[in-house]
């Protein structure tokens, strides 16, 4: 196990902790321990931690808010970084420019924008994740997505380079995809250009309607990662799964939600292995019945190479 340099212990709050269970930091509530774990509360702390991992020649992973991750029960080697403390945002009601740190919850930003008459993020009110995660995954709902409104991101390279800016055009956005998923880059912050001058009451109403729709049509009462599979446009993954009668199907503590078939929920005592097995089962069944291979939205860490 690597040793901690004295410089890290001098900066309050950033000393990495050994063997921390990652189940407490994922929305599925599963996953083994991180070899080293830290939750930076500033960009400077994050840079220090990334530099330490690079010097130690260890893997370094950002787990964001853990809402779109499945982490193996055996845990993860190297340094795992939780971004939940890296919060903050600045909204300009006149220009529509919004700056937000990577750990800022995207639902909070959606609500704040609506309150000051900025249109563009109403769809994001029910997304269980952070600004950084939304930028990486091109998160979307209700007919909107991150790429529609994001102008640029500030990133660091895990090799120690940066920070530097990437424009929306440079991010190669597509449905639930971006360049950020392929590179060793960590999102520090994002800039959005929203549409100013709207009636805040109307935007608040739309935001509330979107939230109500999501909470009544999706299983918010149990731990999940949100939608498991990308929609194979123009088809819907949930409908393909439901057509096979898989709603309510269980493997250990993992269940295909009876409310929405594109959600796998932890009904209690689930393991990452249970959930991973369920993902594979659904892929096999759907391909056999419909001739369609479903590709997960969720990122699986610590597993063998998967589709």
From Swiss-Prot:
State whether keyword Cell cycle applies.
yes
Compartment(s):
Cytoplasm
Enzyme Commission number: 1.3.1.98
Q: Which UniProt keywords apply?
A: Cell cycle, Cell division, Cell shape, Cell wall biogenesis/degradation, Cytoplasm, FAD, Flavoprotein, NADP, Oxidoreductase, Peptidoglycan synthesis
Q: Name one GO cellular component term.
A: cytosol
Pfam (any one): MurB_C
GO molecular function terms attached to this record: FAD binding; UDP-N-acetylmuramate dehydrogenase activity
The chemistry this enzyme catalyses reads:
UDP-N-acetyl-alpha-D-muramate + NADP(+) = UDP-N-acetyl-3-O-(1-carboxyvinyl)-alpha-D-glucosamine + NADPH + H(+)
Quote the catalytic residue positions.
176, 227 (proton donor), 297
Domain FAD-binding PCMH-type stretches: 29-197
| Purpose | Cell wall formation.
Q: Which HAMAP family match?
A: MurB
List the NCBIfam families hit by this protein, alphabetically.
Answer: murB, PRK13905.1
Family listed: Belongs to the MurB family.
Q: What is this protein called?
A: UDP-N-acetylenolpyruvoylglucosamine reductase
**Natural source organism:** Prochlorococcus marinus (strain MIT 9313)
């Amino acid at each position: 196990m690597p040793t901690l340099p004295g410089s890290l212990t001098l900066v309050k709050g950033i000393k990495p902790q050994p063997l921390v269970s990652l189940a407490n930091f994922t929305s599925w509530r599963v996953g083994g321990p991180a070899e080293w774990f830290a939750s930076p509360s500033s960009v400077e702390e994050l840079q220090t931690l990334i530099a330490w991992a690079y010097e130690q020649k260890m893997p370094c992973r950002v787990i964001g808010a853990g809402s779109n991750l499945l982490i193996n029960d055996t845990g993860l080697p190297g340094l795992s970084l939780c971004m939940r403390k890296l919060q903050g945002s600045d909204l300009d009601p006149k220009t529509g420019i919004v700056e937000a740190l990577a750990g800022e919850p995207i639902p909070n930003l959606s609500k704040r924008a609506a309150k000051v008459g900025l249109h563009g993020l109403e769809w994001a009110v029910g997304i269980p994740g952070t600004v950084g995660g939304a930028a990486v995954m091109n998160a979307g709902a209700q007919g909107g997505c991150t790429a529609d409104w994001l102008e640029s991101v500030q990133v660091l390279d895990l090799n120690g380079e940066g920070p530097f800016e990437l424009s929306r055009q440079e991010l190669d956005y597509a449905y639930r995809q971006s360049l950020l998923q392929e590179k060793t880059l960590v999102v520090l912050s994002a800039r959005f250009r929203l549409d100013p001058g709207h009636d805040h009451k109307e935007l608040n109403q739309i935001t509330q309607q979107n939230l109500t729709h999501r909470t009544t049509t999706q299983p918010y009462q149990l731990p999940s990662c949100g939608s498991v599979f990308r929609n194979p446009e123009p088809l819907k993954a949930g409908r393909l799964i439901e057509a096979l009668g898989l709603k309510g199907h269980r493997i250990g503590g993992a269940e295909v939600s009876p409310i929405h078939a594109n959600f796998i929920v932890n009904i209690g005592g689930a393991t990452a292995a249970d959930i991973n097995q369920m993902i594979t089962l659904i892929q096999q069944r759907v391909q056999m019945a419909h001739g369609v291979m479903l590709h997960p939205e969720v990122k699986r860490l610590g597993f063998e190479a998967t589709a």
